[in-house]
C-alpha cells in the first residue's frame, strides 16, 4: 500500500512539472511539427491519377459524427472540392491536404448544407496559400448570387486579415471568391466547365425536384472517369452518363427516416 502511495505521489509530481512547463514544451515541439506538416505533400503522395475522397457525408441536420456534403477530387496535380458543407475543409486538413492548394470548388446546387462552408474554404485557401486571385466557384446559374453574398459577408474580415498578416501572406486581391456560372444543361447534354492539363470536368442535369438548378459533375483524366451526383432522385439522365464510367459517387438517403422527421 505504501509503495502504491509513493508511486502515485511521484506521478502527481511529474504531472505537475509537465503541466507547469506546458508552454515551453509546446514551443519546442512546434518547429518540428510545422516542418513535418510543410514537408508533406498529399497530392504528390497519391501520384498522378484521378483520386476521389469524401470530406463530408452528412445532411442538413447536425450530427456528432457527420460533416456536411463534401467531396475531394485530385487530378493533374491539382486539388478540388465538390460542394462545401460544414467542416468539410477541416476534414480535408485532417486527411493531409494543404488547404492553400485548393484550385476550385464545384457546386451541385444551392441547398444550405452544400454551401455553408464556403466562407471558411475561401479564407483558409487564401491565407494558407498567399494567393493573389480569388477562389473560383463553378456552378449552374445562380452561383453568382451565392458568391456575392459570401464575399459581402467576409469583406470586412478580409481587411482585418490583411492588416494583421500583411500583403505577403494575405494579399487583398486574393480574398474571397469568383463565380464561374454555366446554364443548366438539357437532358442528354454535357457542358464542359473546366478543361486544363488533361483534366476535363463536365456538368450534367439531375433530378432534385423541386430544387433547380441541380447538377452532377463528370471528371475525366488520363482515361479514368468519376461521376459525382450531388443530391438527386432517380435520374435517367444520370444513369445514361454513368454507363461505362470507373466510379459513381451517388447520394443515398432513407425515406423512412425522412418521413419520421416530418
Where are the regions a protein language model picked out?
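Binuclear metal-dependent hydrolase catalytic cores
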Residues: 2-226
Amino acid at each position: 500500500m505504501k509503495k502504491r502511495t509513493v508511486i502515485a505521489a511521484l506521478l502527481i509530481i511529474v504531472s505537475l512539472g509537465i503541466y507547469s512547463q506546458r508552454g515551453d514544451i509546446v514551443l519546442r515541439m512546434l518547429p518540428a511539427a510545422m516542418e513535418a506538416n510543410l514537408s508533406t505533400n498529399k497530392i504528390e503522395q497519391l501520384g498522378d491519377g484521378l483520386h476521389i475522397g469524401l470530406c463530408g457525408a452528412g445532411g442538413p441536420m447536425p450530427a456528432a459524427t457527420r460533416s456536411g456534403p463534401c467531396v475531394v477530387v485530385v487530378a493533374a496535380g491539382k486539388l478540388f472540392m465538390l460542394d462545401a458543407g460544414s467542416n468539410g475543409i477541416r476534414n480535408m486538413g485532417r486527411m493531409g491536404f494543404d488547404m492553400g492548394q485548393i484550385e476550385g470548388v464545384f457546386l451541385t446546387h444551392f441547398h444550405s448544407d452544400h454551401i455553408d462552408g464556403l466562407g471558411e474554404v475561401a479564407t483558409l485557401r487564401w491565407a494558407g496559400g498567399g494567393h493573389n486571385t480569388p477562389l473560383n466557384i463553378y456552378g449552374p446559374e445562380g452561383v453568382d448570387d451565392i458568391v456575392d453574398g459570401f464575399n459581402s459577408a467576409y469583406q470586412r474580415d478580409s481587411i482585418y486579415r490583411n492588416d494583421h498578416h500583411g500583403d505577403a501572406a494575405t494579399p487583398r486581391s486574393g480574398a474571397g471568391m469568383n463565380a464561374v456560372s454555366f446554364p443548366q444543361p438539357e437532358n442528354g447534354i454535357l457542358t464542359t466547365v473546366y478543361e486544363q492539363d488533361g483534366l476535363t470536368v463536365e456538368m450534367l442535369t439531375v433530378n432534385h425536384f423541386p430544387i433547380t438548378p441541380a447538377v452532377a459533375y463528370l471528371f475525366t483524366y488520363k482515361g479514368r472517369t468519376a461521376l459525382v451526383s450531388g443530391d438527386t432522385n432517380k435520374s435517367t439522365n444520370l444513369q445514361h452518363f454513368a454507363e461505362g464510367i470507373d466510379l459513381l459517387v451517388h447520394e443515398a438517403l432513407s425515406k423512412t427516416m425522412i418521413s419520421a422527421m416530418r
